Regions:
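A structured beta-alpha segment of the ubiquitous adenosine-cofactor-binding alpha/beta core
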Residues: 49-50, 117-136
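General beta-strand structural signal in soluble alpha/beta enzymes
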Residues: 89, 117-119, 140-142, 162-166
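Generic hydrophobic/aromatic pocket-lining and core-packing "Φ" positions
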Residues: 77-78, 126, 184
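Conserved small-residue-rich beta-alpha loop and adjacent elements
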Residues: 38-113
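N-terminal Rossmann-like NAD(P)+-binding subdomain of aldehyde/semialdehyde dehydrogenases
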Residues: 1-49
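ALDH superfamily catalytic-core signature
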Residues: 109-110, 137, 145-220
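Periplasmic-binding protein-like
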Residues: 78, 136-141
Length: 220
């Protein structure tokens, strides 16, 4: 309901986002368990023996988008926490109401200082944080201009690690043997779901010339 009321996402898509987020959390935990089994190992190279062990990267600034404020943000936040990092988590300007029920869960599940949540406009909050130079990883889902701008604010951007999900011209390719009725349905959903306000929305459709007229007729 919080997704529906604040960002006008329909009920079906809101349920899908919640379920997909829960699945992602479990999948991430399972992936970490597999990774942890190999996190410490002895290796030999050039006559030199080494004990190799993975470790946290440090402080991660997580900036999520408004259109998928639960799923996309948690795709950044959950791996960062599970791998032992501390996080500064700033939700998007819109889509923040759903964070309120999660505050208690974060407080009870993690030590103080592991998950730090700030609310407000990104430019006013993220920019001064980046200028401190304390951020080790910038994890952002948004526009490339925002990523470049924030990266430039870091005094040592050459050592700043980036985890980015940016805009793209996502193509749909329709071949001659495609089931047009099903394809049209998927293309409309892919382009117009949530009014097309998705980084994964279809932006360009490439249709084989042998079926383009029939496709356009049905698509329109």
């Amino acid at each position: 309901k919080l997704l529906m009321w604040e960002i006008c996402k329909n009920k079906t898509d809101s349920y899908k986002e919640f379920d997909r987020t829960v699945d992602y959390i479990y999948d991430t935990i399972n992936a970490y368990k597999m990774l942890d089994r190999k996190s410490a190992k002895f290796d030999k190279e050039g006559g030199i023996h080494a004990h190799i062990r993975r470790g946290p990267l440090g402080i991660i600034l997580c900036l999520g988008p408004y259109n998928y404020p639960l799923n996309e943000t948690f795709c950044l936040l959950i791996p960062a926490i599970i791998m032992g990092n501390t996080t500064i988590f700033k939700p998007a300007k819109h889509g923040v109401l759903l964070i309120a029920p999660l505050l208690k869960a974060f407080k009870e599940s993690f030590p103080p200082g592991v998950v730090n949540i700030l609310f407000g406009r990104g430019r006013k909050i993220a920019t001064p944080i980046m200028k401190t130079g304390y951020i080790d990883v910038l994890a952002l889902i948004g526009h490339s201009s925002s990523a470049v701008s924030l990266q430039d604010e870091h005094p040592n951007k050459n050592r700043l690690r980036l985890v980015l999900g940016l805009e793209a011209k996502n193509p749909g390719i329709i071949l001659p043997d495609a089931d047009l009725d099903h394809t049209i349905k998927e293309c409309i959903s892919g382009t117009l779901s949530y009014n097309g306000q998705r980084c994964t929305a279809l932006k360009v459709l490439y249709v084989h010339e042998s079926i383009v007229n029939e496709f356009n007729k049905k698509f329109s």
